[in-house]
Regions:
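N-terminal helical cap/lid subdomain that shapes the substrate entry/recognition surface
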Residues: 11-112, 133
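Asp-based, Mg2+/Mn2+-dependent phosphohydrolase catalytic module
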Residues: 3-16, 28-29, 79, 111, ...
Length: 238
């Protein structure tokens, strides 16, 4: 007589991996405020062009070069006056940095949620398309640099999401299998698609969505990072 035994395999959430900008940090609010301050400061310092025209050119440069482009004001000045005026440039840089530091904050409940997850024995990671220097500066400035077991930036993987490379790299750093980890991010086409491609569970951070995403394809949708605690408890329920 043959006896068939059905074994049910329960995967548990052992790690939570976060995108950085617009998931842990309200990046776009900070960026917009800093660029606005820099634009006004450069006008006050002698850049005699309309605010809207200058701001439009800054946005165009970021769209072409990437949001982390560090020479944006240099390129802006070359465009408008054909040279680098260091009085104007320094005014823009100082205003940008001052506003950035004032506005660089986590979303509500980020730190308490991370602490709760740590106390639950959950490993924490970050996968970001930002350069290492910029990612670590942001994490350190808001006091999150010591809370993660692994961090992967563009400089680590040399590939941007949704490539599977950065996701596999963070899984290796955390020492967990894909099915035992959940990815949290605001950009469905990058965070959700990339994580699902390697077998991770996913949570769409609707609170940080800047694209008015209608269909995200994630396993969960969250309006606050605090919801992750109950999601992990649910996934790990026997």
């Amino acid at each position: 007589m043959l006896i068939f035994v059905i074994i049910k395999v329960n995967f548990m959430i052992k790690a939570v991996v976060f995108d950085l900008d617009n998931t842990l940090i309200d990046f776009m609010r900070m960026k917009n405020t800093a660029v606005e301050a820099a634009t006004k400061a450069m006008i006050d310092a002698g850049l005699d062009f309309p605010y809207k025209e200058i701001r439009s050119k800054i946005d165009a440069i970021y769209n072409e070069k990437g949001i982390e482009y560090q020479q944006v004001f240099d390129q802006l000045l070359n465009h408008f006056i054909g040279r680098i005026d260091y009085k104007i440039l320094s005014a823009g840089i100082v205003a940008y940095r001052t506003a950035r530091e004032a506005e660089l904050n986590t979303y509500p409940q980020v730190i308490p949620t991370l602490v709760k997850l740590i106390k639950m024995g959950i490993k924490l990671g970050v996968v970001s398309d930002a350069p290492s220097k910029e990612a670590w500066l942001r994490l350190t400035y808001i006091g999150l640099h010591h809370m993660f077991d692994g961090i992967v930036t563009y400089d680590d993987s040399r590939e941007r999401k949704p490539s599977p490379v950065p996701f596999n790299l963070i899984l290796d750093k955390l020492g967990v299998k894909a099915e035992d980890a959940i990815m949290v991010g605001d950009w469905a086409e990058r965070d959700v698609v990339g994580a699902k491609s390697v077998g991770m569970k996913t949570a769409f951070a609707k609170y940080g969505d800047t694209f008015d995403t209608k269909v995200h394809g994630a396993d969960y949708e969250i309006n606050s990072v605090a919801e992750l605690v109950e999601i992990v408890k649910k996934e790990n329920k026997p």
